[in-house]
Amino acid sequence: MHTGFGEKFGIPRQSGLVPEATGQIVFEPKYRNPDALRGIEEFTHLWIIWGFSENRVEKFTPLVTPPRLGGREKRGVFATRSPFRPNGMGLSSVRLDRVEYKSSKGPIIYVSGVDMLDGTPIYDIKPYLAYADSHPQASDGFAAEHRWDTVHVIWRDEALKSRMDEDTRIAVEHILAQDPRAAYNKAKDYIYGMRYGSFDIRFVADSHAGTIEIVDVVECIDGYHKVK
């Protein structure tokens, strides 16, 4: 999976929270037969089964601290969506935008609403079936009692917006609106950094005012800041 998230910080906590966060699924050579995708474009959404490739779980930990609970309360790992799991597998529901068949790398599936790091291994793809997979009356457990409110994103200098294309700008604004900071680490005067696509975004946050202010945007090329 190729996404704009080159590091863990900033990745949405769940799939679908940021529809503008896009990704491309590129297959290994042995799976590039277009016949394997025949009929997939009849569906609007897909289930993606993938691996937390950057997590190193050396021993089984039965209790974890969900972000929804502010990093203070513990829940059983199987009662949460913690990335630190015994089998290291993730499950995401994404929107199917289109399929490109004429690529030199074989078929490429373009999706949106991703919550995965760039380079994440994909183990399987299945169509999302609303009649079977949607449960409107389902209980959200502790997640329903501890809502994760979005914050208002502002720009310190309007000229910073011109440093990125509109699609990237909108994606960045919506990613930051989810407040990527850890619940236990929300220092008001700290300057945070987030990498998305080829851009390094710096911002400060005010939890009391419910705002995140973008203070700088620097384009990076091959890991180096581009000189303006």
Each predicted region: which residue ranges?
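Enriched for short, Lys/Arg-rich terminal
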Residues: D206-K228
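Short, conserved beta-turn/loop elements at beta-strand boundaries and strand-helix junctions
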Residues: G6, R98-I109, H208
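Residue-level recognition of beta-strand microenvironments
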Residues: G4, V99-K102, V114, I125, ...
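Arg/Lys-rich, positively charged N-terminal/basic patches that mediate binding to nucleic acids
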Residues: M1-P34, I40-E42, A130-H174, A183, ...
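Glycine-rich, pocket-lining loop/helix-strand segments that form or immediately flank
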Residues: W50-F78
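Basic/aromatic recognition patch in beta-strand/loop cores that engages polyanionic ligands
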Residues: K186-S207
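Flexible glycine-rich active-site/ligand-binding loops centered on an Asp-His dyad
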Residues: I109-A143
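Short coil-to-beta-strand transition motifs
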Residues: F84-V94, G197
